[in-house]
């Protein structure tokens, strides 16, 4: 992975859990990567992805910040986590931001509760790396390909 690549880390507005995102930001910055944390407007948009306006907010955030790797954290209800994450991935694929020849987003990570991580790993056949909490700094960086 090249140091010019940009990591965008997201969570929903209702999820107050920030320790994992804060740790990832510190680790990535220590390795000289640029990290963008989603502002409140993007966090709110992630909660309402069925809205075209919310979709545009997220796509604009990714494009304007030239984000190559996206991390999503959701440590509340596992079913909600899978639904929100699924809508995000579907949007990124539909708009050719992910898993297409012209895609700028090379990888997506998910951090959440074990049941949500299990379902996401099953649904995406290992294409999405997950974090369940408690990973060492070395494990975190290794999962992120660093």
What are these regions (language model features)?
Residues 124-127, 146:
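Conserved catalytic or regulatory cores that recognize and/or transform ribose-phosphate-containing ligands
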Residues 14-21:
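Glycine- and acidic-residue-enriched helix-capping/strand-helix junction motifs
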């Amino acid at each position: 992975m090249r140091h010019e690549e940009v990591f965008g880390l997201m969570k929903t507005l209702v999820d107050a859990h920030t320790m994992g995102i804060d740790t990832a930001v510190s680790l990535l910055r220590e390795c000289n990567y640029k990290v963008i944390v989603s502002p409140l407007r993007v966090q709110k948009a992630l909660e309402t992805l069925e809205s075209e306006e919310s979709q545009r907010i997220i796509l604009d955030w990714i494009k304007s910040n030239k984000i190559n790797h996206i991390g999503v954290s959701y440590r509340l209800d596992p079913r909600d986590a899978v639904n929100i994450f699924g809508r995000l991935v579907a949007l990124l694929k539909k708009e050719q931001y992910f898993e297409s020849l012209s895609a700028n987003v090379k990888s997506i990570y998910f951090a959440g509760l074990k049941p949500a991580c299990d379902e996401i790993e099953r649904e995406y056949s290992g294409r999405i790396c997950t974090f369940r909490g408690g990973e060492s700094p070395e494990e975190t960086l290794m999962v992120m390909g660093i």
